[in-house]
């Protein structure tokens, strides 16, 4: 009926221990249990998080550079207080969850901007019945990036307290994930949008080896009205991301399964770099075909082909993967991803500087990979070699930049 959590500690700041303690508490109250109603769920929850930073309120009135780099302008207290309130409802396949979060005092959410209060509104609606399910999520956030220590210049993911995932589909195919949404709040302080997800499974319960799975997803995000300190002007919110995609999975028999995916993506490339007053929209259409052939109970072969067509950014791409599995322990694969179209001068994309002539040149590179994995109980070892493209790698709604390199990757996963 009642659940209380209390936590306090000193977080890690990249490779060192931070000097700023963080503490918090969470309270959950199940109203449905208290009323003896067990056919559904009604609950309310509340949380508090505090952060202490010594001398956070000190300003630098005569050193504009220090104000910009250390971001202390407008901070009035060494203690940052944040609260949230949540409500949950579930009944006969319908679920509704809402949350409101508030920063009670001014805080630095971007070192280049003044301190300000922040808030988040998040609403989740879901429905499922037999083989159909639908979900919709809406979120508006403003000034909610919260640093462990806002004074260091390193303001990446390792210096972040709160986890605010991106509400877009997390694609598993390489070309669909070539230009993921990285969030507009990094440069503008806020964003508003959401996504809708639909799923339906068509199957005969008496024939398990044959079925259809249909999945569709749509997401859209806009910036919010804000004052751009970088541009020195008020800026209206605008659309920065649209992704519409659907995929169809077909199990033909016990041996053959196919998947087809289509995705349309449009994004504002300018907002990925700075708070620009104008948009530069890039568009891409992605097509994926995936075939798995099960040879016997232990051996299977999978082939995957992808094509991305675009008149913007880096032009067209093609990709292919061949994978052979020896269940339950071994898997081997070889893949290639090729930027197969040159773009006209002035376009975003595949330009590289010749360090001898200092001129921009086209390079249509192959990003090849060969690798394998071994799995035993809870241990998984994966080894690969190849050329890796520079770009953003997203996992669980969190994106990090990965530089281009050619080399060996070794990954070890052990769960216990």
PLM regions and their residue ranges:
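Residue-level signal for short amphipathic helical patches enriched in basic/charged
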Residues: 325
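Signature for the C-terminal beta-barrel architecture of outer-membrane proteins
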Residues: 1-303, 307-318, 328-364, 368-369, ...
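C-terminal structured domain segments
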Residues: 364-395
């Amino acid at each position: 009926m009642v659940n209380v959590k209390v936590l306090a500690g000193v977080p890690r700041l990249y490779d060192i221990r931070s000097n700023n303690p963080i503490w918090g508490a969470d309270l959950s109250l199940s109203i449905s249990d208290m009323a003896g109603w067990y056919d559904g769920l009604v609950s309310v929850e509340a949380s508090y998080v505090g952060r202490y930073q010594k001398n956070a309120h000190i300003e630098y009135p005569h050193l504009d550079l220090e104000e910009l780099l250390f971001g202390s302008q407008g901070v009035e207290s060494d203690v940052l207080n944040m609260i949230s309130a949540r409500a949950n409802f579930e009944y006969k396949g319908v679920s509704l969850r809402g949350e409101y979060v508030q920063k009670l005092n001014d805080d630095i959410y971007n070192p280049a901007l003044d301190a300000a209060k922040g808030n988040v509104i998040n609403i989740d609606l879901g429905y499922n019945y037999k083989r159909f399910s639908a979900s919709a999520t809406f979120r508006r956030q403003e000034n909610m990036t919260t640093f462990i220590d806002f004074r260091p210049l390193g303001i990446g993911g390792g210096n972040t307290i709160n986890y605010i995932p991106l509400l877009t589909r997390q694609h598993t195919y390489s070309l669909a994930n070539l230009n993921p949404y990285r969030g507009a709040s990094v440069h503008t302080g806020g964003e508003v949008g959401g996504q809708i997800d639909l799923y339906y499974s068509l199957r005969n319960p008496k024939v398990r080896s044959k079925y259809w799975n249909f999945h569709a997803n749509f997401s859209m995000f806009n910036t919010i009205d804000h004052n751009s300190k970088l541009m020195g002007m008020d800026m209206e919110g605008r659309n920065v991301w649209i992704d519409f995609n659907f995929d169809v999975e077909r199990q033909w028999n016990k041996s053959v399964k196919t998947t087809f995916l289509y995705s349309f993506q449009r994004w504002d490339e300018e907002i990925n770099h700075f708070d620009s007053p104008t948009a530069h929209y890039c568009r891409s259409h992605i097509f994926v075909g995936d075939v798995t052939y099960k040879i016997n109970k232990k051996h299977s072969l999978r082939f995957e082909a992808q094509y991305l067509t675009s008149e913007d950014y880096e032009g067209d791409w093609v990709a292919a993967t061949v994978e052979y599995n020896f269940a339950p322990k071994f898997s081997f694969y070889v893949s290639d991803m090729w930027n197969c179209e040159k773009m006209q001068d002035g376009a975003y994309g595949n330009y590289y500087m010749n360090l001898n002539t200092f001129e921009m040149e086209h390079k249509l590179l192959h990003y090849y990979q060969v690798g394998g994995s071994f799995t035993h109980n809870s241990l998984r070892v994966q080894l690969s070699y190849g050329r890796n493209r520079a770009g953003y790698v997203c996992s669980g709604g969190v994106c990090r930049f990965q530089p281009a390199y050619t080399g060996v990757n070794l990954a070890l996963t052990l769960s216990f």
